[in-house]
Amino acid sequence: YLRLDGGVAPIYSEHLKDCPLSTDELFEAGQRNTDRAPLLHRGPIGAGAWALHGEGFFTASKAANLGAVLDEIDVGADAGVLFCLPHKHVLGLHPIDPGDPYWALKSMALLHCEETERHVDPMLSPFIFHRAPTGEVEAVAIPGGVVYDDPRVLILPAPLFDAILDAAGCESTPVR
C-alpha cells in the first residue's frame, strides 16, 4: 500500500516502473513498517489464547514475521502455535499443548468466528494456520460456525499438525 495524505491505496505494477528500489527492498521496507505498526492490544485474551489488535491495515500482516512476534510476547510456543487472521485488524494465536492440541484449535476457531461475526471488515482469511517451531506454516482448518458454544471446524490435511494430533492420540476426523 502507498500511504497518502487521505489514507492508503494499493500499489500496482505500473506505480513501480520508475521506482529506484527493487521488489525485495520494497518488501523489506514494507515489513519494517508493518513491524512498527502500533497495536491497541497485545496480550492474552483468555484460556491460553493471545491476540494482537490494531487500527491499521497491517496488524494481520505481522503474521509474515510471526517468529519475531512470538519472541516479543514469549507465549511459550515450543511445540508450535496455531494462528488465524480473521480480518486485517487482528492476529490471533494460541500455543499448542502437545497433550491437547485440540484446545488451541477450538480456541482459534472460536476467536475467528467471533471476530468475523462482529466486525464490519470483510474476512481476510478463512483458515486456521499452524506454525511449526521450525518456521514452516500450513493451513490446518476452516472454522465452520459455532453450535451451542462449541466451534465446528473442517480439519484439512496438514502433515506437521497431523503428527502432533497422532502423538497426542487424537482422532483427526475431517469435521470436529
Which residues does each predicted region cover?
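Short amphipathic alpha-helix segments
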Residues: 59-74
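C-terminal structured domains
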Residues: 77-176
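Short amphipathic alpha-helical segments
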Residues: 22-26, 61-65, 100-107
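Generic structural signal for short, solvent-exposed loop/turn connectors between secondary structure elements
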Residues: 46-47, 74-76
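Residues that form generic nucleotide/phosphate-binding pockets
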Residues: 26-33, 69-72, 167
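Charged, alpha-helical interface segments at or near domain boundaries
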Residues: 1-61
